[in-house]
Amino acid sequence: MSEKFAGKTTSTCYPSQPLGNTNKPLELYLFIDPLCPECWGLEPVIKKLTIEYGRFFTLRHILSGTWATWSARKGTKPEAMAKAWEWAANRTGMSCDGSVWLENPISSPFAPSLAIKAAEMQGKRAGLRFLRKLQEQLFLEKQNVADLSVLAECAVKAGLDVDEFLRDMHSPGAAKAFQCDLKITSEMDVDEIPTLVLFNENIEDEGIKISGCYPYDIYVELIAEMLGFHPEPSSPPPLESFLSHFKFVATKEVAVVYNWTIQEAETEMKKLQLKQKVERVPVKHGTFWRYIDDSRP
């Protein structure tokens, strides 16, 4: 399941300073691909891990290019891709509509990753907001996220400077940043996604690499192993605060973060729906909820 990892190799692609709060003892590298349904399925776990233990780690998303190795998938029929997505949705609880491969297939596997790197040029948080919007457009709305107009729409929804984003999309900087991610992926010998690699402050210690999707408690145990003690989890914020921050979430995400069943999460969300705090958004597999922001003009 997990394996010891010798450590980060010397590379200009690694940040010269730890990301975010330099007092945090752990650094986590999450290897993903924006087209990967299993990476999308890990979102509830990452949200919960960040809320409960984020004070102990910085998290860096690395685009692995795994799905972008398109030549290996050219022989895969759209029907098989669609079936794989449906299977992933049923297994993870995060909806993804496989019929996109039959109706509106992604025309280029590299464009979404380059777009994410272009968005990151407006800041790490901007990049993460853009990644989320891109995933929503792909997995829920069945949009071809290699299309420039779709990517521009994602940029608008993520609150980016769209003109700057479109310029950066075709800049050497975005391409170089993506190449850095591919180099890190190769150096850390990542050949499956999602993969999480954990390092602590002691550069002589081995890291831990875990590939695939696992129950939440497994990731907590890995953090405890790297810290050398079992930390107390932080409590999640009030539900309305959580929704106000993330804006658009799945019932599955609410259930995981608050340790509720899907039915319990649905019940709590319906209470907020009656108060006109959220809007229910049915999707192919389950339900999403959009926060209604009364503070907007």
Curated annotation (Swiss-Prot):
Is this entry keyworded DNA damage?
A: no
Q: Which domain of life is it from?
A: Bacteria
What the entry lists under InterPro entries is as follows:
Adapter_SpxH (IPR046404), Thioredoxin-like_sf (IPR036249)
Q: Name one Pfam family in it.
A: Thioredoxin_5
Cell location: Cytoplasm
Q: Which UniProt keywords apply?
A: Cytoplasm
Provide the effect of E27A: Decreases interaction with Spx
Please state the protein's primary subcellular location. cytoplasm
Checking Gene3D superfamilies in the record gives:
Glutaredoxin, putative protein disulfide isomerase domain
Q: Where is the signal peptide, in residue numbers?
A: none
Q: Which GO terms describe its cellular component?
A: cytoplasm
Q: What does this protein do?
A: Adapter protein required for efficient degradation of Spx by ClpXP under non-stress conditions. Interaction with Spx stabilizes Spx and exposes the C-terminus of Spx for recognition and proteolysis by ClpXP.
**How does the annotation summarize its subunit structure?**
Monomer. Interacts with Spx.
The text of the family note is:
Belongs to the SpxH family.
Notes concerning its domains: Contains a DsbA-like thioredoxin domain connected via a linker to a C-terminal domain reminiscent of the winged helix-turn-helix fold.
Name the UniProt record assigns to this protein: ClpXP adapter protein SpxH
Q: Which organism is it from?
A: Geobacillus kaustophilus (strain HTA426)
